[in-house]
Curated annotation (Swiss-Prot):
This is Small ribosomal subunit protein uS17. One of its GO terms (cellular component) is cytosolic small ribosomal subunit. Part of the 30S ribosomal subunit. The keyword Transcription does not apply. One of the primary rRNA binding proteins, it binds specifically to the 5'-end of 16S ribosomal RNA. GO terms for biological process: translation. Belongs to the universal ribosomal protein uS17 family. GO terms for molecular function: rRNA binding; structural constituent of ribosome. CDD domains: Ribosomal_uS17.
Length: 84
């Protein structure tokens, strides 16, 4: 699999309590199939953070990768915006 074809997401760090792992919540808007109302949905991903550089509330870019553990299939590419 080429790196250019891997999925990327931008999300917010919701937990950094694990060693070399962060939890990132990715927000998205979905239209309800029957009523048409726009609903906010979020999904949490466990992300590999090799250098423990991301902190809570940082906006980060993550990329799909090979399975690194039971739950981790994403890795940190860059920190888009640091938390204030």
């Amino acid at each position: 699999m080429e790196r250019s074809n891997r999925k990327t997401r931008i999300g917010r760090v919701v937990s950094d309590k694990m060693e070399k792992t962060i939890v990132v919540a990715v927000e998205g808007k979905v239209r309800h199939p029957l009523y048409g109302k726009t609903i906010n949905r979020s999904k949490k991903f466990k992300v590999h953070d090799e250098n423990n550089e991301a902190r809570i509330n940082d906006r980060v870019l993550i990329m799909e990768t090979r399975p690194l553990s039971k739950d981790k299939r994403w890795r940190l590419v860059q920190i888009v915006e640091k938390a204030k």
